[in-house]
């Protein structure tokens, strides 16, 4: 299995500085739990947020499934606490839409003007982990 994730570093939101929660603690947790068997990069934001979501489940022998949108994939949003919208696309691995999704992802993954390496923003802060866990558990977050 090959998992690649591009995350917003949560350094800016709506013109205000942020402290990296939730994505930095989440990225650290994902790397730790996967024994670093996933690859993570950060979108290189400059005041804006990288909020788009593309999830591609690939299969050469079966139909590919893609979820596209901007809905946060969190307990709060999946649990109907926030009205979100995504698009579900099913297509063959060699179809034009799947090819375009690959091209877009590879462009931002491989070009350093779009993404930076995981080490740039990784945080192992116990306090940030605690704040993230607390706000997620109690539904006190905006994510």
Predicted regions and their residues:
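PLD/PLD-like phosphodiesterase catalytic module centered on the HKD motif
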Residues: 1-143
């Amino acid at each position: 299995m090959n998992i690649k994730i591009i995350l917003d570093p949560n350094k800016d939101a709506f013109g205000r500085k942020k402290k990296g929660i939730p994505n930095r603690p989440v990225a650290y947790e994902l790397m730790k739990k996967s024994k670093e068997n996933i690859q993570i990069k950060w979108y290189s934001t400059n005041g804006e947020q990288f909020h788009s979501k593309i999830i591609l489940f690939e299969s050469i022998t079966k139909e590919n499934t893609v979820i596209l949108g901007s809905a946060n994939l969190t307990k709060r949003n999946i649990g109907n606490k926030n009205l979100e919208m995504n698009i579900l696309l099913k297509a063959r691995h060699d179809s034009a839409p799947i090819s375009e999704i690959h091209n877009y992802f590879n462009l931002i993954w491989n070009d350093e003007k779009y993404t930076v390496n995981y080490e740039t923003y990784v945080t192992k802060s116990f306090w940030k982990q605690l704040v993230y866990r607390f706000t997620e558990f109690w539904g006190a977050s905006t994510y």
